[in-house]
Amino acid sequence: MGSMERLRQLVDILNEYSYQYYVLDEPVVSDKEYDQLYDELVLLEKELNTVLEDSPTIRVGGDVLKNFKAHNHLAPLWSLDKCKTPEELISWDLRVRRLLEGSGVPIEYVMEYKFDGLTLNLTYNNGQLVQAATRGNGTTGEGILEQVKTIKTIPLTIPHKGRIEVQGEGLMGLSVLAAYNKTALEPLKNPRNAAAGALRNLDPKVTAKRKLSAFCYNVGFYEGIDFNTHMEILAFLKANKFPVSNYTKKFHTIHQVIEEIETIGEQVKSLDFLTDGLVIKVNHMEARRLLGYTQKFPRWAMAFKFEAEEMTTELKDVIWQVGRTGKLTPAAVLEPIDIGGVTVSRATLNNWEDIQRKKVKIGCRVWIRRSNDVIPEIMGSIEETLEGAMDIEKPQHCPACHSEVVERGAHIFCPNSLSCKPQLVSRIVHYASRDAMDIVGFSEKTAEQLFEELNLRDLADLYEIKYEDLIKLPRFGDKKARNLLEAIENSKNCKLDSFVYALGIPNVGRKTATDLAKHYKSFQAIQEAEFQELITLPDVGDIVAQSIIDFFEDEEIKKSVNRLINEGIRPLFKEVEQQENIFLGKTVVVTGTLEKYGRKEIKELLEKLGAKVTGSVSKNTDFLLAGEAAGSKLEKAMEIIASGVETSLRIISEAEFEAML
């Protein structure tokens, strides 16, 4: 795999993991695995001197859900840089001292717990709690005022009358969770998800039943008061009756910080709430101002992450699961065990080689490592328990369709792409998805019904479904049947890039499909593409190019694609005739909420005008289109313009944008 291709792959993987963690509250990988991929990305960006516009290294978190009204923070809620070793803390301290050299500002550190709950941003005006919001993407969160009002430790009124934003963490105590689960019809699995789920529930009564608590630790925006140090902020919070942790310590050297970290382990284990580390902050505000920020982190703070917790349990079984590409992945079934307030019963084993390397057997005891509130990993087996344990059988046949499997490198695949249910159902769902053929109303449940009841075995079979077939299916009334048939019919007239993406070519994502369409301009040309030309395209390396060629040379795929074309699929590339306009060839960034356009709509419109739409502001940006509640991008644009650096950057409103069209 080429370096640029790996860069693109890492960005896509990390963004998906971030979406699962921050938006859905359903983390799918361990913090350790995420950190390893993130660190690899950072090194690769330095090596290539390239940062992609959607790289997680310049982002602050995830997207906002649509269930709640968006709220724009008065001040950004930053992510924190992190480290795991004393050596890394010392390196950070050296950077801080180098940047502050000659400033005369004293260097002191304050250390606090890093709470493992849901971040809250509380807005007070004239002494009243007027808004509470989740962190969201750092500049825009979700308004959850009514839910937060149910947390009895958060004051509804405070003595201070100026406008302020107080940052904190919503938590569910371990003892509260245990008491709740004794009477709950559906026990909650862990405190973090319990708190997050309660605060993001549309019914505040549900939130109230969880009996949440909170700790506040910062004032991000303030009027009518000023602070010289972080300790003054904490004193202000206490004076205004905010819940503040009783653990806050000030240190004069980083070595004092490290000594404290080395002795705090037992104290942390006795807490009634989860914490996944410590936060070390520069105490003096003037020092923070001088240190400033990177694109993602404040230079004046560092999160020290605790070592992952490890325990042992019995491996009860291994279930092999089949994905869209036919790859078989082993899932470990464990004797349920509580690790840090989380009941762990499943873990993912990567592949057959992983099973062999870790020497695990069914019935043996295995080491489980859990880093924070994430899916755990099996580290290995306890050798003394292997005797009498049962070997895990290497699958010779697909667990779903019983076809003989094949091995490709470290992975095992089911080659029966035509009638293996998990593969076909996943492939049909992908084909019908919004970014692909956009068949409205199509779901995984629908795909399973069509597979089971109508014997759907090929993508082209979708276009041969009759009304009489659908109306017989459970949960299919007249309206639903007609709507689905209409959506399937409408999908025949599709964009070339959407069709290419819908086919599910291995290693070809949405962007690569778009690049292929723009370059070749016809489906036939893509089918006949040659290796040497393919690798000249953006982000297409040897592996992606070979994947495309292999895909279209497969005889079964040829038959399937020909059937789709014969069914009336007309994938067209529309060359946009770009008339001379002010945005042609310009770089544009969009921020905030627009009144007349969604984010996808405005991006498509700008691209039709010949503009390049990017996600970050720099001196090379030509236009920043700023909607309502624009956040950090607007601030950065204003800073660039005010700095006097040579730039053509111009900030425009939605009304100005429309006047320029």
UniProtKB/Swiss-Prot annotation:
> Which keywords accompany this UniProt record?
DNA damage, DNA repair, DNA replication, Ligase, Magnesium, Manganese, Metal-binding, NAD, Zinc
Could you tell me which residue ranges the BRCT domain spans? Answer: 578-661
Q: Which Pfam families match?
A: BRCT, DNA_ligase_aden, DNA_ligase_OB, HHH_2, HHH_5, Nlig-Ia
- What GO molecular-function term can you cite, just one? metal ion binding
Q: Which domain of life is it from?
A: Bacteria
Record Gene3D superfamilies: 5' to 3' exonuclease, C-terminal subdomain, BRCT domain, DNA ligase/mRNA capping enzyme, Helix hairpin bin, Nucleic acid-binding proteins
What is the name attached to this protein's record? DNA ligase
Chain positions recorded as Zn(2+) binding sites = C398, C401, C414, C420
Return the similarity comment.
Answer: Belongs to the NAD-dependent DNA ligase family. LigA subfamily.
What positions constitute the catalytic site? Answer: K114 (n6-amp-lysine intermediate)
Enzyme type, top EC level: ligase
**EC numbers, comma separated:** 6.5.1.2
Under PANTHER family, the record lists: CHROMOSOME TRANSMISSION FIDELITY FACTOR 18, DNA LIGASE
Q: Which residues bind NAD(+)?
A: D31, K32, E33, Y34, D35, S79, L80, E112, R135, E169, K281, K305
Please name the CDD domains in this protein's record: BRCT_DNA_ligase_like, LIGANc
InterPro entries for the chain: BRCT_dom (IPR001357), BRCT_dom_sf (IPR036420), DisA/LigA_HHH (IPR041663), DNA_ligase (IPR001679), DNAligase_adenylation (IPR013839), DNAligase_N (IPR013840), Hlx-hairpin-Hlx_DNA-bd_motif (IPR003583), NA-bd_OB-fold (IPR012340)
Functional summary from the UniProt entry: DNA ligase that catalyzes the formation of phosphodiester linkages between 5'-phosphoryl and 3'-hydroxyl groups in double-stranded DNA using NAD as a coenzyme and as the energy source for the reaction. It is essential for DNA replication and repair of damaged DNA.
Q: Which gene encodes it?
A: ligA
For this protein, the record's HAMAP family field holds: DNA_ligase_A
Q: Which cofactor does it need?
A: Mg(2+); Mn(2+)
The protein's annotated catalytic reaction(s) are:
NAD(+) + (deoxyribonucleotide)n-3'-hydroxyl + 5'-phospho-(deoxyribonucleotide)m = (deoxyribonucleotide)n+m + AMP + beta-nicotinamide D-nucleotide
Task: Please list the GO biological process terms of this entry.
Answer: DNA repair; DNA replication
What GO terms fall under cellular component here?
cytosol
